[in-house]
């Protein structure tokens, strides 16, 4: 009979943790990748974490609203995408603020500043500013796509 090696094992040998150690989830590459995300990167203040997360979200939220939104077949599709993305960022900021207020009521600061009400408030503020900025950058690029395309093609030397 062939001997089989278990690829999926309990995390740190403890089956009661509720996490499985797989070649993907427990690899050095995955740990490095997740460790470099703004939520886990060391040395970032909560407002900078929120700013970075917000910029990414604001930038990529324009696309679905532009291509799939109610104004997709009109000349106002880009402004419709901008308004939809800004509204969604506003709702997400309200949800982040509510989460921070409810979760960290009356708790004093711990080692991680993101685990306090004040830190979470800073994260939400950074998310709002970054999200709005990212959405406006994406709108500017979409609205001036012919100019940006010309720059990359070398027409403006």
Swiss-Prot record:
One BP term from GO: photosynthesis
Membrane topology of this protein: Multi-pass membrane protein
GO CC aspect terms: photosystem I; photosystem I reaction center; plasma membrane; plasma membrane-derived thylakoid membrane
Alphabetic keyword roster: Membrane, Photosynthesis, Photosystem I, Thylakoid, Transmembrane, Transmembrane helix
Transmembrane segments: 82-102, 127-147
Coiled coil: none
Protein name: Photosystem I reaction center subunit XI
């Amino acid at each position: 009979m062939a001997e089989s090696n278990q690829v999926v094992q309990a995390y740190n040998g403890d089956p009661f943790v509720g996490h499985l150690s797989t070649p993907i989830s427990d690899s050095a590459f995955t740990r490095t990748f997740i460790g470099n995300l703004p939520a886990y990167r060391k040395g970032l203040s909560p407002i900078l974490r929120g700013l970075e997360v917000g910029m990414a979200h604001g930038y990529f939220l324009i696309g679905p609203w532009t291509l799939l939104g109610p104004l997709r077949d009109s000349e106002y599709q880009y402004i419709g995408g901008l308004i939809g993305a800004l509204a969604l960022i506003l709702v997400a900021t309200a949800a982040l603020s509510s989460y921070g207020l409810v979760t960290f009521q009356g708790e004093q600061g711990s080692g991680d500043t993101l685990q306090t009400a004040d830190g979470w408030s800073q994260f939400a503020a950074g998310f709002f500013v970054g999200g709005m900025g990212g959405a406006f950058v994406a709108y500017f690029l979409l609205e001036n796509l012919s100019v940006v395309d010309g720059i990359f093609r070398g027409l403006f030397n």
